[in-house]
Amino acid sequence: EGRETIFKGDACHIDALKEHIQIRQMIVAWSEHLHWSFPDGESAQWNQRYWDQGNLKPKASLDEAMRDFFINPDKCSLGCYTATKIVIIQGILDYFRRVKKDDAMADAIIKRLKSDDDVLVGIEPGAMWSFQKPINLDEQKRLGKLLKIQTQVAPMNFIPGDWVYFVNTDKDSSEKDGYEGSNSIYMGRASFDDFYNDNEHHYLYNEKIQNIYNWRNGVFSRSRHFQRMQILSAEQLHQFGLSPEEGGFLVKNRAIPYFFGFEPF
């Protein structure tokens, strides 16, 4: 049981597959050594040279602003939703700008990001959040600026560069700002990102599941609150790796990059 990734039309070409893999590799590469700060209920912080409360300043270069998140991580404090989008944008832009040296495509991506004057909003399709209730039908139909959706993905099915979402199903801890769930990038080798370097730059799959479960025990930092950590059994790890409809944490949706240059975006 898994999922299909279909390359059709102009994308039915080995070059489309190769480029898609390379873009995913770039997303993973930019997720590997992060140490941003988590706002933990406070307002996000931004480098004011480039950003005004999350909005790109009119004269700021988006290429420079994105690189700055990784060069000066101490100048920002970001939740996992924003952090995920930053890594994905940087991975895609860096691939076309620096690796492929396709400035025309990089500029087209920037134009797409700026199409509504809010570069960090809407890079993923609205259907990514189809599990949330009530459902806004217009939002569900909204296409992503840089990503499309794969639905009904089987448990344990991940491809490096996937945007994955884990829901915190515990009523009390999920009401704490920032702990409603976890936006994550799958890095390969059973690992997910660690935006805040709380666990040596990555979480193994079982660690990720245990992390989310233990929010109900007040474990909001694995490194600081490890004494409160409850270790889950193999049966519990299996259960919580299922979808929320089945009593688990893992949403069946995956947001993945378009086949840039081989399909409209």
PLM regions and their residue ranges:
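Cysteine-nucleophile amide-bond enzymes
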Residues: 1-163, 167-178, 187-265
